[in-house]
């Protein structure tokens, strides 16, 4: 975990991926730093301090989700994104709001499990190599077939067999040492062997996914899992592939799942972040039965946000110290349309601004994962070096901004559409082009995009 970052350092890290939106970055940076501060307090005071939940308000495509996602990734905290519109009131068919907490715990378990696997990786690989040696050179017990029970009982021919057994053991030991040496040198990587692996079975949980009955599926699966033995099947694989499978199996045996569960539940409770998107879609004044149902979802979310215990397959999980970040465009409604109790649970309000053409220019070139860097790297795999002139980048940004103004404003996501259309022909013909370097000029951008951008009816369908 990396909770030691100062708010300024967190903002600097977020700047590497997200352009603008300083207020939102500052809000999440302070929220993260407060978690670090809280961890330093004495226990009785620490229990009294709950995180201040954040409500992000802004149009689509301005970075609401990205800010929260990058924030969680930065500190390695369990993070999930859910959509408020996917939930239904308790008693109706669909997902209940408690499933977001169960999903968070599942994410936390996966993170902790991956960390534990890395810790035991060397030992797991060592044991996997021993299993490979055993498969390639079986021990005498496995090689020998039927033994005369009378001979075993009365020790007949015991003396005469001892010498031959000792010689056989020596020969096998030499073979095993030779195979170990070859495995270490990587000389047997392509050798095909037959191994037994644990069969992956489709779970009850998978069948009930999205029906609102996931918890029942998980409980049923656990009950069956403790009774039914695990199935194995034989597979023919190269030594290289077999080592990966066997290493994974050995790692799963080496890690203590009780320890994983305990740490995962702790992280979910103390460090977990739940991002609730589209919260504006469940806001609104009561006017019909649909709105009543939306208010019901808000009332179901309320106890989760203010702190309650949720039953999961890993035990009861407290939601008191989970950080909730809600977001919405609030085009058709406003934050005050949420029920007052829920409004009070999101004391930090942050408004994200619309993106300008200048912001689009920065988005195209400045972030570590900038779009132009992505497309340049993709086409470089075909042996083509692509260069965008500054004027061409400005032209792309202006066209994307103008299309947003003329049609629906989808923020930075418009750049993906524009870039795909711009490089469509080039991407299609890349494997056949003999030129080593191609420069994208404003004229090329104009030729590919300007006509479509100017025609409002066409741009609605293409851009």
Swiss-Prot record:
Transmembrane segments: none annotated. SMART domains: AAA (SM00382), ClpB_D2-small (SM01086). InterPro entries: AAA+_ATPase, ATP-dep_Clp_protease_ClpX, ATPase_AAA_core, Clp_ATPase_C, HslU, P-loop_NTPase. Pfam families: AAA, AAA_2, ClpB_D2-small. It comes from the Bacteria. The keyword Secreted does not apply. One of its GO terms (molecular function) is ATP hydrolysis activity. Keywords: ATP-binding, Chaperone, Cytoplasm, Nucleotide-binding, Stress response. Residues 154-175 are annotated as: Disordered. It is found in: Cytoplasm. One of its GO terms (biological process) is proteolysis involved in protein catabolic process. Its main location: cytoplasm. ATPase subunit of a proteasome-like degradation complex; this subunit has chaperone activity. The binding of ATP and its subsequent hydrolysis by HslU are essential for unfolding of protein substrates subsequently hydrolyzed by HslV. HslU recognizes the N-terminal part of its protein substrates and unfolds these before they are guided to HslV for hydrolysis. Belongs to the ClpX chaperone family. HslU subfamily. A double ring-shaped homohexamer of HslV is capped on each side by a ring-shaped HslU homohexamer. The assembly of the HslU/HslV complex is dependent on binding of ATP. This is ATP-dependent protease ATPase subunit HslU. It comes from Bacillus mycoides (strain KBAB4). The gene is hslU.
């Amino acid at each position: 975990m990396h909770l030691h970052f100062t708010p300024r350092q967190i903002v600097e890290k977020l700047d590497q991926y997200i352009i603008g939106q300083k207020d939102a970055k500052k809000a999440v940076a302070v929220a993260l730093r407060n978690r670090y501060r809280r961890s330093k307090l004495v226990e009785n005071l620490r229990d009294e301090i709950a995180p201040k939940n954040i409500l992000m308000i802004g149009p689509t495509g301005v970075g609401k989700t990205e800010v929260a996602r990058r924030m969680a990734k930065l500190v390695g905290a369990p993070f999930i994104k859910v959509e408020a519109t996917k939930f239904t009131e308790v008693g109706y068919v669909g997902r209940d709001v408690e499933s977001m907490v169960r999903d968070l715990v599942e994410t936390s378990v996966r993170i902790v499990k991956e960390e534990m696997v890395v810790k035991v990786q060397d030992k797991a690989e060592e044991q996997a190599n021993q299993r490979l040696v055993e498969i390639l050179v079986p021990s005498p017990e496995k090689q020998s077939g039927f033994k005369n029970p009378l001979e075993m009982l009365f020790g007949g021919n015991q003396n005469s067999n001892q010498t031959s057994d000792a010689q056989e053991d020596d020969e096998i030991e030499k073979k095993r040492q030779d195979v170990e040496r070859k495995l270490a040198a990587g000389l047997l990587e392509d050798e095909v062997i037959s191994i037994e692996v644990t069969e992956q079975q489709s779970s009850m949980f998978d069948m009930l996914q999205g029906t609102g009955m996931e918890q029942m599926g998980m409980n049923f699966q656990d009950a069956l899992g403790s009774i039914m033995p695990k199935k194995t099947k034989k597979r023919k694989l190269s030594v290289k592939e077999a080592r990966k499978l066997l290493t994974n199996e050995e790692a799963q045996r080496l890690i203590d799942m009780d320890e994983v569960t305990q740490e995962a539940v702790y992280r979910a409770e103390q460090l977990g972040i739940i991002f609730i998107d589209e919260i504006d879609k469940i806001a609104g004044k009561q006017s019909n039965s649909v709105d009543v149902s939306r208010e019901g979802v808000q009332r179901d979310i309320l106890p989760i946000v203010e702190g309650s215990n949720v039953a999961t397959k890993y035990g009861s999980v407290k939601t008191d110290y989970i950080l909730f970040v809600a977001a919405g465009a609030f085009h058709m409604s406003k934050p005050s349309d949420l029920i007052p109790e829920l409004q009070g649970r999101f004391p930090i309000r942050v408004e994200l601004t619309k993106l300008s053409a200048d912001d689009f220019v920065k988005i195209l070139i400045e972030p570590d994962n900038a779009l132009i860097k992505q497309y340049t790297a993709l086409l470089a795999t075909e042996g083509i070096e692509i260069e965008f002139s500054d004027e061409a980048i400005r032209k792309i940004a202006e066209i994307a901004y103008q299309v947003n103004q003329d049609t629906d404003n989808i923020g930075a996501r418009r750049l993906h559409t524009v870039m795909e259309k711009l490089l469509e022909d080039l991407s299609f013909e890349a494997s056949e082009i003999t030129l080593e370097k191609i420069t994208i000029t404003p004229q090329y951008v104009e030729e590919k995009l300007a006509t479509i951008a100017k025609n409002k009816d066409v741009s609605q369908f293409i851009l």
